[in-house]
Each structure stands twice: as structure tokens, then as C-alpha cells.
């Protein structure tokens, strides 16, 4: 089977905000072009969302790809390579990766909700990648749909001409054939030279139990054939190709992949570390010298410790993280130890949803029971002797007297919210030490830009934003700069012992409120022991908040009937002595729920 003529190939991705229907549109495109039969599609929604967790939450986490055959109205046969991308801000890395492999994008906007913050972010990614963009209005069959208003919004906010936007309902299939024609007529074919030396972009890689590492590639020039020896230019590792093929969405093997095509290769690669996303693949015998411009590697923004509840699970956790790292290039981890929690890992994530998803995948796919420590960001510190250091973990913070300056990362947040919730949204941003930059109106919705410290966003900002706006506000952010900050290290002491897993860096003005909220929450969740347990929040040697868990008390005087008071007193004194001793040597068991709840408190 020879590869298709390059003019008849269209590589495109679907960009949209969460829940605007891009995975459903992908289902319809697969169905209409015959990628899967109606029988195979029956009872299956979001075909490309292969993880259970993706279907349950209704979000796309991993970018997926599928190849479709389509006979257009002009009578020619076309090949479409569709990349379904995530919409959530944490997975922007997956988006940029997919966009690098395509020439065009379908911009899907919900006709009842309009342009959202992450729609904007993803469109800008697509424009940066030099894409041709076709606007598609989805859910036009809903009673609340306002297509004309949304078209105007696309023109006002994004600056795209939406006069010939395609009107569809992905759920019912209405207008979807028009999308297929628009892909043919309005998106450009890829460029490439079949006779040139092999040059291909490594788009993604994941681990398959039977095949080893599977690599998703986009061929730019030349041809990839079975049996060919290839070289990864970034890692300098060479392999013999065993299988070459594409997804329909099922894995289908072919003899070769030509320029402009997107497909997969397997080559007995054992280490996913050898396949760096964004790397250039070339022919080992006739290598090219210039690498393709890769995309920027993902930089972890949020760090937290993950520890197994059962210490015997440590090796299982190490293996599980290695496997997830195979499929998720943006996830990083290194070993760490904690006095309270034993051995575990310090992990880096792109954001809080990313953290939650990884944690959930570890517990589901590998049956691990984990404790997560307080999420933190990267702080830069200048010491009094002039040296500079970066801190990922509050436990590593040097002595206060040695620190000349602490700098924390700031972000620029773009929030789109219906007008009636604007006051609550602005108050939330002010409470989080934000500085308002601009406020504009798009119809009945306000678009507000704020500078915020990332430290204030990583805990629960997204949840709070959703609750103050009844779920209507959308949010997107990017890192801007580091600024000096008045931060202090707050520790939580349980029975006078610091719990390192709960220490955190907080702004001095918010330390007391946060400390009080945490100790109150811990008091509710630590079960009573045989002795009194003080729970304290401290900055340095100063206690800023305290709660006490009352002791369980056995009635030692129960069998004394009347008689002399000294007998009772003697028994009570004896009990008191015993409790004193217990408190000295007793160990307090802190349940996992107490850790999780303490980290989720809002000061």
C-alpha cells in the first residue's frame, strides 16, 4: 500500500474549551467517514477518550489521534489525520504538542455558552503554530443557543472572521458533513518532499505491554519503512523499525508512512526516556543535520509529595510512576523522605487538575493508597552571602536569618464571567493578593485580567472561582515573572512534634487565618487518644493558633462506693500520672483524611 498524495492529506486538530463538544464531534467524524461501524460506536461515546477517568469526568487528558478516509464532493479521496486535544489549562502541553503536528484547526465553540478563557488560550497556541482556523459553532439545536451573538464574540475577542462559521450539533450529527467539506476546502495540505532525507517529529510516546514503547510520529520529509534503522537526534539512540502504521482508531499496520502523514512506529524501545517528545527522528544511514524546531518542554509548576500509606508499597509506587511518566512527558518525580510519612516521591505537575488526575490514575490503575502533601510552587531565594537557590519543598527552606530575599512566581490570569458574578470574582482575586490589570466587556460577559501570586492559585482557587460564579466563570493563566514577597514558613505541630508533610510557605498577612483554619480542621479529624493532644500552628518559635483534642477518660472511681474522698483522689492522681507519661511517649496517629482535609482548607 503506497502512501497518499500529499495534496490529499489534511492534518488538523480540534481546539475548544472543556465541555464544548470536541470529543463528541470527533465521534461523529469517525462515524460518518466509516472509521468505526455504527455497531462498534453503539453505546460508546468519546471514542478517543480511552481512559475511564476521561469518560467519567467528561474531559480529554491525553491528546489522541485517528486517521479517516473521506471522499469529498469533488470526487477525490482525502486522508484526514485528526488530533483530539484536551481543553483544560493544565494540559496545554498536550495541546501544543498536537498543534505542532498539524496545519489547521477546527475551533469548536458552544453556541449557548460562547467563547471561554481556555478557548482563547488554545486558539492563541494554534495561531502561534501558524494554523489556518475554521470556526465551528456546536450545540446550535439547544434552545439557549445564540449563534449570531457568538459569531460576533469570536470576531470581537479572538479577531477571527466567523461569518462563514460552520453550524453543527455534534450530538445529533446536524451539519457535520459541512465540517468535512470545510476541512477539504479551507485547510491547507501539508508540505513535504518524499525524496528528501527522513525528517519526522516525535509527537507522543506511551508504553504498551505487548509492543514496548509506541511512538506517535509526524513525517515531514522522506519515508518511514518497516526494517529501516532510525535515530532519535535528541538522545542519539538508534533502533530498527518493527511496525509502522496508523490509528483508525484501531492500530493498523502499513509498509510505510510518507511526508505529511501521522502514524505510529514501534522499534523494541524499552526505555520511554529515549523517546523525548518534540525530538526529531532521522534515518541512521543518511541523517539530517538540522533538527526540527521542537516545542518547548513542559515545566512543572506545582510540586507535592506523594507517599504510600503502606510503606511496603514503595517499590510498586516507583514502578507505577515510571509507567505514568512513559505516557505523560510533563510529569516529573524524584525520591524524598519525610519524618512523618516515610519514603515517597516529590512530584512536579502542570497544575492542580494534573495532580489530581495522576493521583487518581495511581490509585485506580495500580491500586495504590496514597497520601499527598501540601502542593507548593518553586520559590527563588537569595541568601545573605549572595548565593541563590530554588526551593520546591518548604521543608528545605534555610534558616530565616540566612535569607536576604524570597521571590515567588506570579501569573497573569484571564477570567471570563457573566456580569452578575463579577463582584464575587473580583473579591476573590483581591483576597488572593491580586492586582487588576484590565476589565473589558464582551456582550453580557466580563473579561478580567489579574496578576496573581501562583502560591494563592494552586490550593483551591479554581474550585472557589467555580463556586462564587455558580460554575459559569472560566479561567486560564500563564506564568509571567518572579517578584519579592514577604513569605514565612508555617509548621503544624501535633503533640509538640512538627508534621513536615503539612509545613508550607504562606504570605505573612494570611498565615494566621490559614493556620487557624488548619488546626480547627485537624481537631475535627484526629480521633481522641488516651491523653490530651495539642495541635498548634507555628511560625518559627511563635505559636499563632492552637486547638486541643480532649483525652478519652476512663472512670477509675466507678467501683468506689461512698467512703473516704482520699481513696478517690489517690486513683485520680494515679491516672493523671499515667496520662502524663503517655503524653510524653505516646504516638499520635493522624488519619489520612486529616492530611487531605487540612490541605484543602480555605483561610
UniProtKB/Swiss-Prot annotation:
Required for accurate and efficient protein synthesis under certain stress conditions. May act as a fidelity factor of the translation reaction, by catalyzing a one-codon backward translocation of tRNAs on improperly translocated ribosomes. Back-translocation proceeds from a post-translocation (POST) complex to a pre-translocation (PRE) complex, thus giving elongation factor G a second chance to translocate the tRNAs correctly. Binds to ribosomes in a GTP-dependent manner. Belongs to the TRAFAC class translation factor GTPase superfamily. Classic translation factor GTPase family. LepA subfamily. GTP binds at residues 19-24, 138-141. It comes from Rhodopseudomonas palustris (strain HaA2). It is found in: Cell inner membrane. It is an enzyme of class 3 (hydrolase). NCBIfam families: lepA, small_GTP. This is Elongation factor 4. GO terms for biological process: positive regulation of translation. Its main location: membrane. Residues 7-191 form the tr-type G domain. SMART domains: EFG_C.
Amino acid at each position: 500500500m503506497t502512501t497518499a498524495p500529499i495534496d490529499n492529506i489534511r492534518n488538523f486538530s480540534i481546539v475548544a474549551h472543556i465541555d464544548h463538544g470536541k470529543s463528541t464531534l470527533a465521534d461523529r467524524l469517525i462515524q460518518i467517514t466509516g472509521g468505526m461501524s455504527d455497531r462498534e460506536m453503539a453505546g460508546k461515546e468519546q471514542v478517543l477518550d480511552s481512559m475511564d477517568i476521561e469518560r467519567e469526568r467528561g474531559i480529554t487528558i491525553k491528546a489522541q489521534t485517528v486517521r479517516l478516509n473521506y471522499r469529498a464532493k469533488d470526487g477525490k479521496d482525502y486522508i484526514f489525520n485528526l488530533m483530539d486535544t484536551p481543553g483544560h489549562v493544565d494540559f496545554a502541553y498536550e495541546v501544543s504538542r498536537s498543534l505542532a503536528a498539524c496545519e489547521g484547526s477546527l475551533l469548536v465553540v458552544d453556541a449557548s455558552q460562547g467563547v471561554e478563557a481556555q478557548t482563547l488560550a488554545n486558539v492563541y497556541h494554534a495561531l502561534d503554530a501558524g494554523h489556518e482556523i475554521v470556526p465551528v459553532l456546536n450545540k446550535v439545536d439547544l434552545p439557549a443557543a445564540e449563534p449570531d451573538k457568538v459569531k460576533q464574540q469570536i470576531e470581537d475577542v479572538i479577531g477571527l472572521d466567523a461569518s462563514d462559521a460552520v453550524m453543527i450539533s455534534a450530538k445529533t450529527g446536524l451539519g457535520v458533513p459541512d465540517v468535512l467539506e470545510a476541512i477539504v476546502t479551507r485547510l491547507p495540505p501539508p508540505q513535504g518532499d518524499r525524496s528528501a532525507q527522513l525528517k519526522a517529529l516525535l509527537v507522543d510516546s506511551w508504553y504498551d505491554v505487548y509492543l514496548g514503547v509506541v511512538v506517535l510520529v509526524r513525517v515531514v520529509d522522506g519515508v518511514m519503512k518497516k526494517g529501516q534503522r532510525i535515530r532519535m537526534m535528541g538522545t542519539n539512540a538508534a533502533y530498527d523499525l518493527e511496525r509502522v502504521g496508523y490509528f483508525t482508531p484501531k492500530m493498523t499496520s502499513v509498509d510505510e508512512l510518507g511526508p505529511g502523514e501521522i502514524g505510529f512506529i514501534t522499534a523494541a524501545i524499552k526505555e520511554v526516556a529515549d523517546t523525548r517528545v518534540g525530538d526529531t527522528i532521522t534515518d541512521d544511514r543518511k541523517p539530517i543535520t538540522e533538527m526540527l524546531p521542537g516545542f518547548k518542554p513542559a515545566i512543572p509548576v506545582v510540586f507535592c509529595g506523594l507517599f504510600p500509606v503502606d510503606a511496603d508499597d514503595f517499590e510498586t509506587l516507583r514502578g507505577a510512576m515510571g509507567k505514568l511518566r512513559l505516557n505523560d512527558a510533563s510529569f516529573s518525580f524524584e525520591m524524598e523522605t519525610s519524618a512523618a510519612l516515610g519514603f515517597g516521591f516529590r512530584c512536579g505537575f502542570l497544575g492542580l487538575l494534573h495532580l489530581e488526575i495522576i493521583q487518581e490514575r495511581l490509585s485506580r490503575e495500580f491500586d495504590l493508597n496514597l497520601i499527598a502533601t501540601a502542593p507548593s510552587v518553586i520559590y527563588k531565594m537569595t541568601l545573605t552571602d549572595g548565593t541563590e537557590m530554588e526551593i520546591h519543598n518548604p521543608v528545605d527552606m534555610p534558616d530565616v536569618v540566612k535569607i536576604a530575599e524570597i521571590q515567588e512566581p506570579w501569573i497573569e490570569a484571564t477570567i471570563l464571567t457573566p456580569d452578575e458574578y463579577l463582584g464575587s470574582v473580583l473579591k476573590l482575586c483581591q483576597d488572593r493578593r491580586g492586582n487588576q490589570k484590565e476589565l473589558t466587556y464582551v456582550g453580557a460577559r466580563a473579561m478580567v485580567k489579574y496578576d496573581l501570586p501562583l502560591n494563592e492559585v494552586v490550593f483551591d482557587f479554581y474550585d472557589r472561582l467555580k463556586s462564587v460564579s455558580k460554575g459559569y466563570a472560566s479561567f486560564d493563566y500563564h506564568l509571567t515573572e518572579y517578584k519579592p514577597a514577604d513569605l514565612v514558613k508555617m509548621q503544624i505541630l501535633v503533640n509538640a512534634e512538627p508534621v513536615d508533610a503539612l509545613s508550607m510557605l504562606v504570605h505573612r498577612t494570611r498565615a494566621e487565618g490559614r493556620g487557624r483554619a488548619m488546626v480547627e480542621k485537624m481537631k475535627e479529624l484526629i480521633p481522641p487518644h488516651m491523653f490530651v493532644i495539642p495541635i498548634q500552628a507555628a511560625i518559627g518559635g511563635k505559636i499563632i493558633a492552637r486547638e486541643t483534642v480532649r483525652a478519652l477518660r476512663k472512670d477509675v472511681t466507678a467501683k468506689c462506693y461512698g467512703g473516704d474522698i482520699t481513696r478517690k483522689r489517690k486513683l485520680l492522681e494515679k491516672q493523671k500520672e499515667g496520662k502524663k507519661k503517655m503524653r510524653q511517649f505516646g504516638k499520635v496517629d493522624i488519619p489520612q483524611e486529616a492530611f487531605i482535609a487540612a490541605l484543602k482548607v480555605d483561610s
